[in-house]
């Protein structure tokens, strides 16, 4: 791996992204009703990329994708709990896809009609056996990776447009958290269905709470890693402000989804003013991309706690300007370890209750 040039991995990444996105087109939008596309179609991308890195020919790569079809998984129910399984979906997709490719490279075969067959992936996870004509349109002429989104906030993407609207209104009108009487966020279907959580009790729930994230943006200035640390989750200013944030379904925005992921935000200020914004795109989307500096800032924020700041800077420089991959990195933590999940033994035993636990 240390001698691997940059062209082959780049080709593998582009191909993996292309395969997963086109399979996603074939099964959407009905697939998203029960399935999380990152965990499902992401598996096909990982299988394709790994197969190409391993030097598989077209037949072996096809078997990698076929085997990935039976490995793919990731349920929408994971979004609707305080559990940690949802963030595991991308890791599982990468692991399962890589395993499928390693097996294919060694001669393991899959059902080559696993995607489109009558009881295959599309039939099992969407409303039909797949919109393959639509999925294959423009193949080789346009590439999905050129229209990718970089996440600019550390929470659910269905909240992004609302957060961008609040940030723009704050910059334009100069108000702070203490000036806000109420916030109303109108969104499309998943914004309401997945992210209308007025009383989140855990880090995972907070990442899917539009109310919490809007309040955290106003109080902390951003919604990145620090917004989900224990101190932020217990911050009385965020708690109080989040109770004044309402979320509703906007029919116009719902009709435009998934082609457009927008938000309409109205902020009522204590001085009597009401300011509003229709946020038609999200920062980080193809039509509003992050700058190179913003991407570097995000990379460093995520990488430095794992490999250390000097190594993160060197790695970024190598990825930007080098003609070969930097090789395997020792993932030695340079920062204090993240808190462990509370031990079950430390909790007093309580009778089961049908009520959800209180948030704070």
Residue ranges and their predicted role:
Residues 3-99, 106, 111-119, 124:
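Glycine-rich, mobile lid/loop segments that gate access to catalytic sites or pores
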Residues 85-95, 102-360:
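Terminal-appendage/accessory-domain detector
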């Amino acid at each position: 791996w240390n001698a691997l040039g940059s062209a082959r991995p780049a080709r593998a990444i582009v191909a993996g992204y292309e395969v997963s996105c086109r399979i996603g087109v074939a099964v959407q939008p009905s697939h998203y009703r029960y399935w999380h596309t990152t965990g499902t179609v992401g598996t096909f991308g990982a299988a394709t990329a790994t197969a190409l890195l391993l030097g598989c020919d077209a037949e072996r790569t096809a078997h990698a994708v076929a085997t990935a079809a039976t490995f793919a998984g990731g349920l929408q129910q994971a979004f609707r709990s305080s559990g940690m399984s949802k963030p595991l979906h991308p890791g599982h997709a990468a692991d399962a896809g890589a395993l499928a490719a390693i097996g294919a490279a060694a001669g393991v075969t899959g059902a080559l009609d696993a995607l489109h067959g009558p009881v295959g992936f599309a039939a099992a996870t969407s409303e039909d056996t797949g919109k393959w004509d639509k999925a294959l349109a423009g193949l080789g002429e346009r590439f999905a990776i050129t229209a990718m989104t970089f996440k600019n906030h550390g929470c659910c993407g269905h909240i992004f447009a609302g957060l961008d609207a609040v940030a723009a209104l704050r910059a334009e009108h100069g108000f702070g958290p203490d000036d806000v009487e109420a916030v109303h966020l109108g969104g499309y279907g998943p914004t309401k269905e997945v992210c209308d959580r007025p009383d989140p009790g855990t880090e995972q729930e907070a990442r899917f709470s539009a109310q919490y994230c809007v309040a955290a943006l106003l109080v902390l200035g951003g919604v990145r890693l620090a917004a989900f640390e224990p101190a932020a989750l217990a911050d009385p200013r965020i708690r109080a402000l989040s109770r004044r944030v309402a979320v509703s379904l906007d029919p116009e925005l719902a009709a435009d989804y998934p082609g457009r992921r927008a938000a309409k935000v109205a902020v009522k200020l204590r001085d009597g003013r009401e300011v509003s914004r229709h946020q038609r795109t999200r920062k980080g989307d193809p039509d509003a991309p992050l700058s190179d500096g913003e991407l570097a800032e995000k990379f460093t924020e995520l990488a430095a706690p794992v490999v250390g700041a000097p190594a993160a800077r060197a790695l970024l420089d190598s990825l930007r300007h080098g003609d070969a991959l930097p090789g395997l990195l020792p993932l030695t933590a340079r920062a204090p370890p993240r808190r462990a999940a509370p031990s079950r033994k430390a909790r007093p035993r309580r009778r089961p209750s049908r009520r959800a636990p209180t948030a704070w």
